[in-house]
């Protein structure tokens, strides 16, 4: 499946993170797998071919492209992950949601078995020796290397296992079994993170959606009391090894940011409009590298190509600076007009070097 890696070199990514004057703003243009059944495939391939800055490794194949869907993104094919959570989706390529929670009834808790972090990511099996070998191959090729914890690793995972409403009720009432479950999740994640450190990756990415359209999914006080200590333990070996910590959350996380950042986060990946460009700039510009997730709700699906061009420039001027501290990522999903997709690709290419002009 064709998606971009970052347009920038390993050296430029490191310079952006460390405020050491990158040659350009690192850009990532991700094409969700659902797009290959929504758009004319040749039209998408044409756009990729026309924008080599965003897709530096793209090679057009002469055979028909067959989309590959993740286990949790196959319509009509429910998937039970290694935590026992049953996933379903209505559209091929779009990650589904958990429809059956293995501990919806906590009377089952004492019989509940965690997956083995030496053999599983939580979603599927993993061979850590193979992972280390792949990291070594990428390093030998001069590429940026990553260790990616599964998306929704702690609080969301607890919700997937127990159910969102029951999770919040349990935390409010400080139910011992749920608090124990949360601690066990932290230990599971920590075991995986130690493998990333052992493999000597450049960056450890820790993604979990904590925000909604307005405000967080969990109160700041509850996050601070129950989830933050787990985060702190998870980040400690990454900090001690001198690796880059990349933290991701969708949604409005403004009231959680200070607690999220306290663990020594080097890169924060958050959404632009729901948090506000000016707020993001005021909190992070010149201090912490922002991996800015570009709007998918208003401007890119419904704006004009001219508005999109102006918006990408505004993002870079508002949040970035000549020394670095900014990366941009855009995720393409069905529904964005092709002319807007083209405008996005062109603007991301055009303004990547804005601070070097």
Where in this protein do the model-derived segments appear?
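Active-site loop segments of alpha/beta catalytic cores
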Residues: 1-41, 80, 89, 114-357
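Intrinsically disordered, low-complexity segments enriched in proline/serine/threonine
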Residues: 28, 54, 58, 66, ...
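Segments that shape or occlude catalytic/ligand-binding pockets
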Residues: 34-72
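A contiguous, low-structure linker/loop signature
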Residues: 69-120, 140-144
């Amino acid at each position: 499946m064709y998606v971009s890696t970052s347009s920038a070199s390993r050296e430029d990514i490191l310079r952006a993170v460390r405020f050491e004057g990158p040659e350009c703003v690192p850009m990532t243009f991700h094409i969700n797998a659902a797009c290959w059944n929504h758009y004319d495939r040749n039209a998408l391939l044409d756009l990729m071919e026309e924008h080599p800055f965003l897709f530096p490794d793209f090679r057009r194949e002469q055979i028909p492209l067959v989309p590959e869907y993740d286990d949790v993104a196959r319509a009509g094919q429910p998937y039970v992950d290694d935590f026992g959570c049953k996933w379903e989706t209505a559209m091929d390529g779009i990650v589904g949601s958990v429809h059956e929670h293995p501990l919806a009834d906590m009377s089952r808790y004492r019989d509940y078995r965690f997956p083995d972090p030496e053999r599983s990511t939580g979603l599927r099996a993993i061979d850590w020796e193979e992972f280390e070998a792949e990291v070594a191959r990428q390093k030998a090729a001069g590429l940026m290397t990553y260790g990616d914890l599964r998306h929704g690793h702690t609080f969301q995972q607890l919700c997937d296992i127990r159910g969102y409403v029951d999770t919040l009720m349990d935390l409010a009432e400080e139910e011992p079994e749920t608090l124990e479950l949360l601690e066990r999740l932290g230990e599971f994640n920590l075991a995986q993170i130690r493998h990333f450190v052992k493999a000597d990756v450049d960056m450890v990415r820790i993604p979990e959606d904590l925000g909604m359209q307005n405000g967080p999914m969990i109160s700041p006080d509850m996050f601070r009391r129950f989830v933050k200590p787990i985060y702190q333990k998870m980040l400690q070996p990454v900090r001690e090894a001198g690796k880059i910590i990349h933290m991701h959350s969708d949604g409005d996380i403004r009231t959680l940011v200070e607690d999220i950042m306290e663990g020594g986060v080097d890169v924060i990946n958050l959404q632009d409009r729901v948090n506000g460009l000016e707020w993001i700039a005021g909190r992070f510009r010149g201090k912490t590298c922002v991996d800015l997730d570009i709007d998918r709700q208003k401007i890119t699906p419904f704006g004009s190509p001219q508005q999109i061009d102006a918006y990408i420039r505004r993002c870079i001027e508002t949040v970035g600076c000549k020394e670095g501290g900014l990366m941009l990522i855009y995720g393409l999903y069905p529904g964005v007009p092709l002319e807007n997709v083209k405008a996005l690709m062109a603007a991301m290419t055009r303004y990547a070097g804005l601070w070097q002009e």
